[in-house]
Amino acid sequence: MFEAKSGLRNIATTITSIGLSAALVLGAGIGAAEAATAAPKLPATVSFLKSAFSDADIQNRMTTGFALESFIQLAGAGVTAAKLSPAIRAEFTRSDRIFGSSMKPGYLVDPVTKKLKPGLAGKFLYASKVLKARNSTFQNDVVDALSVEIAVDGAVAASKGNAQDIAWVVLGLQAHGDRADARRVVTALLKLQHTDGGFNYDPTLTTGGTDVTAIAIQALKSVPLSNKSATKKRNSVVAQAVAFLKGAAVGGNHFEAWGDVDPNGTAYAIMGLQAAGENTSAYVTWLSARVQGDGGIEAPWAPGAGDRYVTAQGYLPLIGKTYVSLLAGK
């Protein structure tokens, strides 16, 4: 998962009994005018995901990244920004929501440093691309602000070596078409691999994490590099990251964290391994078994029902897509 698992678990435990049902009662965040042009795969899961982040709570949910990611995952079902509700579209098209005002920072801005949050900014660029959002001016503004943070060697100052953030910067820049900057940031990402082959939030750690390693693999695989030497180095790093994931798997079909099963990490690992050309059928079978009657994917802290935080990261791997293939339009 993207946020600290312990913190998310506490939040999720609090909201499970009221938050999910409230989101369903308050109304779906996707506009009613959505055209049924082609039936998506796993329609019940798509329906669950559409209602997971409602108009009523969307403004308070954008800062974590999960709402943005749920919209990214819906792009895999053919949803575009034009099919989102006005309240959700505003999160992509209103300056006061994106960057903020003199009274309140936007969701892409750190309230303490007043600078752009690099990982969330990358996710915004990626989401804007795959959702076909009509917000090119704001995308350009985000890229300009990100460029200031990117050093000559590709390091992203505000990320403080957080491989998750840097991976999303790569994906966002690549989505926006800034391939030269994306390649530079790839160089910095390669240097963040731990000795065990994994990547993590903190460069001072000695071990990798499942989800961060998986998003790093996808970021690295999303960018065509300019020469054979760079490509060889990237491929070597990816191979070590793949070996890390395979070694961390439990029972050859899922991952665990904090003493329990980790469906988010498993979902991410599926996408990372698939992006690297690995067979993920056993992992997909395990994740598919956690899909509940409401279409959502079950979380260990809320058994018997779908969880919006898990489903926000789990739909694409269930239908055989990754953040690399989605960006390529596949």
Task: Give short role names for the model-derived ranges.
Residues M1-K5, L24, E278:
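Non-Sec secretion/translocation targeting segments of pathogen effectors
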Residues T16-E34:
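C-terminal segment of classical bacterial N-terminal signal peptides
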Residues D55-A82, P105-S136, V156-R184, T195-V237, ...:
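An alpha-helical repeat/solenoid feature that recognizes helix-turn-helix modules
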Residues A36-S54, T80-L108, R134-D153, D178-L192, ...:
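Extended, well-ordered alpha-helical scaffold segments
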Residues A28-A32, I150-A157:
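Structural signature of transmembrane alpha-helix termini at the membrane-water interface
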Residues M1-I15:
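Bacterial Sec-dependent N-terminal signal peptides
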Residues M1, Q292-P300:
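Short helix/strand-capping connector loops at secondary-structure junctions
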